[in-house]
């Protein structure tokens, strides 16, 4: 399987089955997906549909049991070893005894970069998420939204072109979430990174994305891929426009079509 230089993630007929004491669990089935350089791609679907599992396969945190997957033309394992991506988890996962600056530099210490390079990258990443001035603060001194921005800065410090984000704003209230959505969109526009983003929120998926991947209940399959054409400098006001509502309606209809209410 060969990948174009503009293809960042290339998935073909990929499946994943977990073996358990109660028998096999079919998590993903026959997934085909291409993510191109500079795209913001959201995965949306019901709980348990495999959104996070798919992201973890891309990150080499889970191994596919069938099909093919390439990240920048190499295997997920090689991409992980090459540090080709940054990963933002659902919770900030900041170490409480380390300052924000030292939380951001932690993976860079593991990479054995020089102190000067670690600090340069950390300060640059914190500036991108508008946390410059908070370098010496500790996680408990920051709000939940600010902690998640610090987590994003840590992922950005790798200076990788691919950013993987697993429901990073899911635990935040709606107003804070809206603010961080706008900040993330500005960050994407400035850096032109490729983003794969897991969410349960239809408005969030539509607002952020250039491509929306709608998934079915387990076993997770892709039932629709919706491309948007909104301006990169869009604001939250776009959510009231007919164009936005039309895309949101298509996402909702895709989720309804793939959902079972037999439980």
Each language-model region and where it sits:
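Conserved signature/switch motifs of ABC ATPase nucleotide-binding domains
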Residues: 137-140, 158
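Helix-to-loop junction immediately C-terminal to a conserved catalytic motif
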Residues: 59
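Conserved ABC transporter NBD signature motif
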Residues: 67-77, 121
């Amino acid at each position: 399987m060969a990948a174009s230089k503009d293809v960042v993630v290339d998935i073909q007929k990929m499946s994943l089955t977990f073996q358990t004491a109660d028998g096999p669990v079919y998590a993903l089935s026959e997934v085909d997906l291409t993510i191109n350089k500079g795209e913001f791609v959201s995965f949306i679907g019901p709980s348990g549909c495999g959104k996070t599992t798919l992201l973890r396969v891309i990150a080499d945190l889970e191994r596919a049991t069938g099909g093919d997957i390439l990240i920048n033309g190499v295997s997920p394992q090689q991409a992980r070893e090459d540090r080709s991506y940054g990963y933002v988890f659902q919770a900030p996962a900041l170490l409480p005894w380390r300052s924000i600056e030292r939380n951001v530099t932690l993976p860079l210490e593991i990479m054995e970069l020089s102190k000067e390079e670690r600090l340069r990258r950390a300060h640059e990443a914190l500036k991108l998420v508008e946390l410059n001035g908070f370098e010496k603060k500790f996680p408990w001194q920051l709000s939940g939204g600010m902690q998640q921005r610090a987590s994003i800065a840590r992922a950005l410090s790798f200076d990788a072109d691919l950013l993987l984000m697993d429901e990073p704003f899911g635990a935040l209230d709606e107003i804070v979430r809206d603010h961080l959505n706008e900040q993330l969109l500005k960050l994407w526009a400035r850096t032109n990174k490729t983003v794969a983003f897991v969410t349960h929120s239809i408005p969030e998926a539509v607002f952020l994305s250039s491509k929306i991947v709608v998934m079915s209940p387990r076993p997770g399959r892709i039932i629709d891929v919706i491309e948007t054409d909104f301006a990169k400098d869009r604001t939250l006001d776009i959510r009231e426009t007919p164009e936005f509502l039309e895309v949101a309606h298509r996402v909702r209809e895709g989720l309804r079509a793939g959902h079972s209410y037999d439980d």
